[in-house]
Amino acid sequence: GVSVSQVPKAVKAFQEIAEKYRVTIATYGHASDGNLHTKMVIDPLDKDEWDRGVQAVNEIFDVCIELGGTVTGEHGVGLSKAPNFMKERQSEISSIKAIKAAMDPENILNPGKLEQWTGPFLRDLRYPCPEYMGHSPAVKE
């Protein structure tokens, strides 16, 4: 999310990123409070398209941060946002880990997620992606 005054700049930047990487990106959300959501339409089995999508997502998060916003302003972080959240909040990660350890010493609440995340996040997604499919014939070269 970004501040309301930055929404037009963010949406324009997202459109430019979509064109740059030749991907379809839908932007929607709660513009009145700066919460923007982007959804990309890609074939996760097409390695080239997947790679372009990953680059586009990283640039979208960079734009949000550059405009004074955040990579996650409304919902939980989730696995797909984890790398960019970690980059944005580097100075806070040790505190997050300490709070998690103090509140959940047996690690039964959402184990292996953000506070323990070491990447790459792609291995834990619920849909296939080229990096973790090896040389499957389903991957389009």
Regions found by a protein language model. Name each.
Residues G1-E141:
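Conserved glycine-rich FAD pyrophosphate-binding loop
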